[in-house]
């Protein structure tokens, strides 16, 4: 599975510039952390914006983590096994960022239960995901189901504000804020 993700990262330009403004603003607005986890952090583009004393960037792609090392030489880098428990102790982080990750995860219940486990009580979970809603339905009508929901696409899940809120609530998180900006759903929740 890691090979698949490494092949995807090979298609991403090495210097793709800064992250989109709405994501930068969202991450910069998160509370400072003692220990932060950028889960699915890829090349570390957003991890550079986290105010944390200690930063861990974890991803399934070794190629992405090599890029993250160049951006974040002081961060702990951890390669993950897909759909496996996270290799961190219970209640280890006070902030977990999952930026554009949930839509790619096979077992979202395992993933979020593991996030909850490694997050300390009252710790912060920050989630971003592409927004889907009525416009997605119109796009399906206009362009066709198969084209919109390509079975070879790395995207497995299509979330709306409401479905993300329900998912986080069902997994034991308290949603603190939920917004939609520039085609993204942005959520902050507490354990």
Label the model's feature ranges.
Residues 100-104:
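A short His-aromatic
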């Amino acid at each position: 599975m890691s090979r698949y993700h490494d092949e995807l990262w090979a298609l991403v330009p090495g210097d793709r510039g800064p992250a989109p403004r709405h994501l930068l603003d969202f991450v910069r607005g998160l509370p400072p952390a003692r220990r932060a986890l950028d889960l699915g952090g890829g090349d570390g583009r957003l991890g550079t914006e986290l105010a944390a004393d200690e930063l861990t960037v974890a991803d399934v792609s070794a190629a992405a983590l090599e890029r993250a090392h160049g951006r974040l030489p002081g961060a702990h880098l951890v390669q993950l096994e897909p759909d496996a428990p996270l290799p961190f102790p219970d209640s280890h982080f006070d902030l977990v960022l999952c930026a554009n990750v949930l839509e790619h995860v096979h077992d979202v219940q395992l993933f979020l239960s593991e996030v909850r486990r490694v997050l300390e009580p009252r710790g912060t979970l920050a989630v971003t995901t592409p927004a889907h809603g009525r416009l997605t339905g119109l796009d399906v009508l206009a362009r066709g189901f198969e084209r919109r929901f390509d079975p070879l696409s790395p995207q497995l899940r299509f979330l709306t504000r409401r479905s993300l809120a329900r998912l986080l609530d069902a997994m034991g998180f308290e949603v603190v804020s939920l917004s939609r900006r520039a085609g993204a759903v942005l959520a902050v929740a507490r354990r």
